[in-house]
C-alpha cells in the first residue's frame, strides 16, 4: 500500500515541519492548502499512489548564491540571493523577485509554493517559482541599486531563460530594478529575449502590467460582490500598503465609485475620511516611485488626513484590501473588521491574513478572496507579456484590459466551482486550492515518477 494511504493531515504536516525547520511561513502555506486537498483527494487513489501533494510541497530546486557589490563609499557588501524553482509541470517557472531585508529561503519557498497554484488558476501555461535577496533598496542610491542588480543577475542568469524560468518584480523590485537586471542579462547572453516580465514598455514590457495586480484584485472583489448581488459603488474601502499593488487597487476602487480611506507603509497608515481620489493617488505614486518618501508625508500634504502608527484595520469600512505583505492582518484585526461591518476582503498581497484571521472571516461568512486567486492578475498579464515577446508583437491597453477582466472572471468561476458551500456562501480558499492543485497534479500524473 502507498504510504500516504495511512497518513492523515496531522502526520503529513508533522513531516513538512520536520523537513523545513525554521521556515514557518512555508509550513503555514502548505498547511492552508493541505487541509483542502486532503478532503479533495480522499477518494482519489491515483493522487495518493503518485504522492502528488508530497511532491508539490517539495520544490524542484532551491538555488542559493552570494551577491557581492560595492556601495558608494567603496565598502564591499555581501548579500544572499535565491531562486526557488517550485514546480514546472504546466509551464516554465514563473514568479517575482523580492528585495527586502526580511527575505529568507523560507519566505521564498512559501511564495513559490503559492505561486504554483496561482499560476495554474490563471489557466495560462506557467509553473511556479520565486526569488530574491536580503537586500534593502531603501535609502540606496540609483548607482548602488544598479550595481546590486547587476551582481545579482550575473549569477541568476545561468538558472533562468524564456523557456526555463521567467522572473518578474515583487516587493522592492519595480521598473528600475527590472531594467537594471534585464540590461545585465542581455549583456551577458548577447540575446534579446523575454526572460523577465514587468519590463518598461520601450523594451518589450506589456501595457497593463503595472496596473494588473491591483486592478485584478478589485475585479475579483467585484465578481465576489456580484455573486451576492452587490457592487463596489458607494462602498468604503481600507487598503494597506502604498506600493504598486496598493496604489492600483485604490485607483480601480475609485474608478468604480468606491471611496478609499487608508493607505500604509511599514511606518504606519494614513486615514483620509474625504477619500483618496485619483489626484491624491497620483501624488502617492510620485512620492513612492520618484521621491521614495514615506506615507506619513501624505498627512502634511492633505488637510483632513491623519497619520497613525500601526496598521489600518481599525478604520471602519465595507471592503478591505490588504496589499502590503504577508501576515499583516491577524485574528484580532479580522475580528475588528467584522465587528465594524466589513462585507468582503480581497487580498492584493500574498498571504496577508494569518490562518486564524481567515477562520474569523469564514465563521462570519464574510466574502474572502485569498491572494492566490485575487492577486493573480499580475502574473496573468506577465504571461501575456511572455506571449507578446515570443510573437514579437504588442497588444494595446484596451485589449489587455479586456483580457485581464476575462481572466479574473475565469479565476472567480473556478473558485466557485470547487468552493460553493451550497448555502450561497463560497469558500474561495478551498475553491482556489483545489482548482489550482488539480491542473498541476494531473500534469504530474501524466509524467510518471520524475
Ligand atoms: P511594493 O514594494 O511596491 O510595495 C510594498 C508595500 O508594502 C510598501 O508600501 C511597503 O512599505 C509595504 N510593506 C512591505 N513590507 C512591509 C512590512 N513588513 N510591514 C508593513 N508594510 C510593509 O510591493 P508590491 O506592491 O509589488 O507588493 C505588495 C504585495 O503584493 C506583496 O505581498 C507581493 O508579494 C504581492 N504581489 C505583488 C505582485 C505585483 O505584481 N507587484 C503580484 C502578486 C502579488 P515600505 O515602503 O515601508 O516598505
Segments (PLM) and residue ranges:
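N-terminal ligand-binding/catalytic initiation module
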Residues: 1-207, 439-449
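Adenosine-phosphate binding glycine-rich loop
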Residues: 2-29, 224, 338-450
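Predominant activation on well-ordered alpha-helical scaffold segments within soluble catalytic domains
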Residues: 13-14, 31, 35, 105, ...
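Active-site nucleophile and cofactor-binding loops and adjacent substrate-binding regions
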Residues: 74, 170-171, 206-213, 238-242, ...
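General beta-strand structural signal in soluble alpha/beta enzymes
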Residues: 110, 164-168, 192-196, 262-265, ...
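Conserved helix-loop functional segments at active or binding sites
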Residues: 187, 222-230, 326, 335, ...
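Glycine-rich phosphate/diphosphate-binding loop of Rossmann-like nucleotide-binding domains
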Residues: 200, 205-316
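Rossmann-like adenosine-cofactor binding region
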Residues: 268-368, 373
Amino acid at each position: 500500500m502507498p504510504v500516504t494511504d495511512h497518513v492523515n493531515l496531522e502526520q503529513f504536516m508533522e513531516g513538512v515541519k520536520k523537513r523545513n525547520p525554521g521556515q514557518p511561513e512555508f509550513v503555514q502555506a502548505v498547511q492552508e492548502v493541505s487541509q483542502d486537498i486532503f478532503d479533495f483527494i480522499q477518494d482519489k487513489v491515483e493522487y495518493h499512489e503518485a504522492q502528488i501533494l508530497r511532491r508539490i510541497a517539495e520544490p524542484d530546486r532551491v538555488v542559493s548564491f552570494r551577491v557581492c557589490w560595492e556601495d558608494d563609499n567603496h565598502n564591499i557588501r555581501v548579500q544572499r540571493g535565491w531562486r526557488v524553482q517550485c514546480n514546472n509541470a504546466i509551464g516554465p517557472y514563473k514568479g517575482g523577485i523580492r528585495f527586502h531585508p526580511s527575505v529568507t529561503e523560507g519566505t521564498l519557498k512559501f511564495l513559490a509554493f503559492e505561486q504554483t497554484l496561482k499560476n495554474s488558476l490563471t489557466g495560462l501555461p506557467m509553473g511556479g517559482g520565486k526569488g530574491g535577496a536580503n537586500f534593502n533598496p531603501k535609502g540606496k542610491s540609483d548607482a548602488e541599486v544598479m550595481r546590486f542588480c547587476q551582481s545579482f543577475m550575473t549569477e541568476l542568469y545561468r538558472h533562468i531563460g524564456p523557456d526555463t524560468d521567467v522572473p518578474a518584480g515583487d516587493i522592492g523590485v519595480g521598473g528600475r530594478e527590472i531594467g537594471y537586471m534585464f540590461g545585465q542579462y542581455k549583456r551577458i547572453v548577447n540575446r534579446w529575449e523575454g526572460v523577465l516580465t514587468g519590463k518598461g514598455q520601450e523594451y518589450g514590457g506589456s501595457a497593463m502590467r503595472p496596473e494588473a495586480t491591483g486592478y485584478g484584485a478589485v475585479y475579483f472583489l467585484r465578481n465576489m460582490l456580484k455573486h451576492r448581488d452587490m457592487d463596489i459603488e458607494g462602498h468604503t474601502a481600507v487598503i494597506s500598503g502604498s506600493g504598486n499593488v496598493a496604489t492600483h487597487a485604490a485607483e480601480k476602487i475609485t474608478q468604480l465609485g468606491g471611496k478609499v480611506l487608508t493607505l500604509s507603509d511599514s511606518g504606519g497608515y494614513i486615514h483620509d475620511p474625504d477619500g483618496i481620489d485619483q489626484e491624491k493617488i497620483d501624488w502617492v505614486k510620485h512620492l513612492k516611485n520618484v521621491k521614495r518618501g514615506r506615507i506619513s508625508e501624505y498627512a502634511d500634504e492633505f488637510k483632513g488626513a491623519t497619520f497613525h502608527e500601526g496598521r489600518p484595520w481599525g478604520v471602519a469600512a465595507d471592503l478591505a484590501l490588504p496589499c502590503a505583505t504577508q501576515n499583516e492582518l491577524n485574528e484580532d484585526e479580522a475580528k475588528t473588521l467584522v465587528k465594524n461591518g466589513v462585507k468582503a476582503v480581497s487580498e492584493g498581497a500574498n498571504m496577508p491574513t494569518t490562518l486564524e484571521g481567515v477562520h474569523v472571516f469564514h465563521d462570519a461568512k464574510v466574502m474572502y478572496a485569498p491572494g492566490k486567486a485575487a492577486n493573480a492578475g499580475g502574473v496573468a498579464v506577465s504571461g501575456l507579456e511572455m506571449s507578446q515577446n515570443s510573437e514579437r508583437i504588442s497588444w494595446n491597453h484596451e485589449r489587455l484590459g479586456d483580457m485581464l477582466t476575462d481572466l479574473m472572471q475565469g479565476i472567480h468561476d473556478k473558485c466557485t466551482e470547487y468552493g460553493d458551500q451550497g448555502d450561497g456562501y463560497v469558500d474561495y480558499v478551498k475553491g482556489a486550492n483545489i482548482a489550482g492543485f488539480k491542473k498541476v497534479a494531473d500534469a504530474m500524473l501524466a509524467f510518471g515518477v520524475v
